[in-house]
């Protein structure tokens, strides 16, 4: 079991997923360009929706990459974690649009699992993670994200308590 690596990844995954939320509060609507540029999929629904922005992805990648050495990981791992976490977030947003869920709505599991599973899988080889390590990391993130979201809502950093 690679517990130190799991914990390091959880820090980076939390950072990768949290920095776009903080950037939204700091910048408001400034620099908020939708990742899908308003593209509509063949089903008539947005590709990702307005809450997935280029600003959020750039801030996530920059901050997470720069933070990785502070917890003993390589810059490359930070970039991989951020990119994979954002890919997971975009994946869940895409699926939610296909399910006709409103933007920023909660779909339990779909909101937490891809955001943590994708980065864990992406770092599996570099950090010698086992399937058990990945399952544990995703499980911890799932529970932690539900708890942390409520605190962020109370601190007025999130618009919804999930």
Model segments located where?
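Interhelical loop and helix-boundary elements at the membrane-water interface
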Residues: 1-80, 86-122, 131-162
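Acidic, glycine-rich low-complexity repeat segments characteristic
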Residues: 126
